[in-house]
């Protein structure tokens, strides 16, 4: 799990809620996945970028739970931000990459509420950023 790049923490527990700060799209080599959907990347590439964000979310959850994912009761919400052109309208399909990964790992308890938001820019030029809220047992 990567450390934050600003004045905030990667995770915070409040009661039974675990908040995960936004995780940006990073490939398997640790390189940022950059670019704008609808210009530099297609929907499938965006889906894969969102999936990478979700992998980082799971890594942060695991670290916050001291290595024990069984401490997670459910995923409450994902918010996905997609760096996209004005004409790109497939943000939900992009963020499915994150949703599908979370559900594949946590099963029914991974089903969550969600927002998939278009933005004209994201930090460091990345293509996708996703944050999350989980409920702990």
Predicted regions and their residues:
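Short, polar/acidic, helix-capping and beta-turn segments at strand->helix junctions
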Residues: 1-137
């Amino acid at each position: 799990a990567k450390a934050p790049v600003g004045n905030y923490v990667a995770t915070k527990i409040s009661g039974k809620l675990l908040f995960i700060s936004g995780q940006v799209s990073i490939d398997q080599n640790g390189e940022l996945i950059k670019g704008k959907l609808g210009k530099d990347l297609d929907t499938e590439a965006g889906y894969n970028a969102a999936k990478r964000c979700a992998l980082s979310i799971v890594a942060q959850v695991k670290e916050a739970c001291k290595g024990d994912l069984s401490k997670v009761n459910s995923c409450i919400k994902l918010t996905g931000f997609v760096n996209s052109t004005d004409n790109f309208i497939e943000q939900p399909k992009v963020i499915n990459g994150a949703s599908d990964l979370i559900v594949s790992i946590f099963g029914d308890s991974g089903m969550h509420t969600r927002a998939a938001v278009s933005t004209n820019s994201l930090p460091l030029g990345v293509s996708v950023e996703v944050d999350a809220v989980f409920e702990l047992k």
